[in-house]
Amino acid sequence: MDLSVENGGLAPGFRFHPTDEELVVYYLKRKIRRKKLRVEAIGETDVYKFDPEELPEKALYKTRDRQWFFFSLRDRKHGSRSSRATERGYWKATGKDRVIHCDSRPVGEKKTLVFHRGRAPNGERTNWVMHEYTLHKEELKRCGGEDVKDAYVLYKIYKKSGSGPKNGEQYGAPFIEEEWAEDDDDDVDEPANQLVVSASVDNSLWGKGLNQSELDDNDIEELMSQVRDQSGPTLQQNGVSGLNSHVDTYNLENLEEDMYLEINDLMEPEPEPTSVEVMENNWNEDGSGLLNDDDFVGADSYFLDLGVTNPQLDFVSGDLKNGFAQSLQVNTSLMTYQANNNQFQQQSGKNQASNWPLRNSYTRQINNGSSWVQELNNDGLTVTRFGEAPGTGDSSEFLNPVPSGISTTNEDDPSKDESSKFASSVWTFLESIPAKPAYASENPFVKLNLVRMSTSGGRFRFTSKSTGNNVVVMDSDSAVKRNKSGGNNDKKKKKNKGFFCLSIIGALCALFWVIIGTMGGSGRPLLW
């Protein structure tokens, strides 16, 4: 194959650019083994007989690439040392030799040389660079000998654009647009009716090495017979639009079902909103975010729609009581389980039993002293007497709020037992809460003593002492000061009493002497 420009050459972008591995394993190895190369791109030239400027003319191919390849015989001057001198200069090795690998095995060696003009060692360095490729010793043994076949060496020569390393520099042929201007006149004429054969046609004709441009009349008739045997359309003319061959298919059953669903949605009436949705939609229609007086008009009808017969009694009292009792039963079991795992579980039965009388007495005094009554003027509802602690003997109940004007203090009501059970469950739930009082005043028996002290007056101080029964001792401020001062206070009081007596005696003596002086001056006798 000829790569010269005079014989047609290559299109722009196509160039001879083999890698180091390809140069050694394919080109150099086949040259040493006297094998034929598929492309004769590298000629045989003695590179040491010519200067670098003369070597491009000796290249086998003429593509104006700025790098050239040559096969050359190794000229040995002193044993294994090669002679690298030319008529006007010499090639000097630079850098380290590199080993070329193929499939993780060494196949060759690469040496870099730079041309120096003049005589060694005072030659002038130039920009001409040459890579010398030799076959590795192990690879030579695979070739069958080392006598004559190792004499061939492959050289790649190029010229750098300047001094120093030029990594990434390209050495391909420069592109000249004018050289390819004549190709614009060569128009390609497409036939009006060009046959496009589908991929499913048997390619036995192409297996014979025939090209599409080499078909004769017999081949065309055989091809047409195969096309007719194929199922479906396999031919298309250029004049026919490609849109005709593209047909979209739909499933008619699915299409009819979708149309029926759309029509059914249009014919069916919209669902009516529930009472809860009506309440939400009617409230805050003005967009202000506040409730108006009109929002509460007709509330009875809304509660009736929700299933409540008497919104004033059942919704407020019955639902509240029953719902709270149900939730209390559920929460009591949960809180009891948590209380068992809390630190209050460590208390002994004796301490717990000792705390109950104090708490019961405290709650009994509060409940016996007064009852809680709250008057709701706006709604006219009255709530009286909440339940007491269990075990006190006092009965109370949780009354339902009813409209004003109806008496609600019926203590002999048959539901008395139910309210007592309810109060007992409430106290059981409160006792199961594992909460420690945040302040001393929140403790029930401490608070009871505070109430008693507030009535008697004076200030008291709580002092904790480590006693056997863990009793909190309360002392007044005067008692604490008295304990601190000790016997010093008694001595001061005795001194104060003596001084007070002396002052009284002195006053009496002074009064006596004043009387004596007065009576003696007037001439009256002192004795009556």
Swiss-Prot record:
This protein's record includes keyword Endoplasmic reticulum: yes
GO molecular function terms attached to this record: DNA-binding transcription factor activity; transcription cis-regulatory region binding
Domain NAC: from-to ranges: 10-160
Subcellular location as annotated: Endoplasmic reticulum membrane; Nucleus
SUPFAM superfamilies noted in UniProt: NAC domain
Transmembrane portions of the chain: 499-519
Superkingdom classification of source: Eukaryota
A family per Pfam: NAM
Stimuli inducing this protein: By heat, salt stress, abscisic acid (ABA) and methyl methanesulfonate (MMS) treatment.
PROSITE patterns on file: NAC
Coiled coil ranges: none
DNA-binding region: 107-166
GO cellular component, one term: nucleus
GO biological process, one term: mitochondria-nucleus signaling pathway
Subunit structure: Interacts with RCD1.
Notes on the domains: The NAC domain includes a DNA binding domain and a dimerization domain.
Name this protein carries in UniProt: NAC domain-containing protein 13
Organism, as annotated: Arabidopsis thaliana
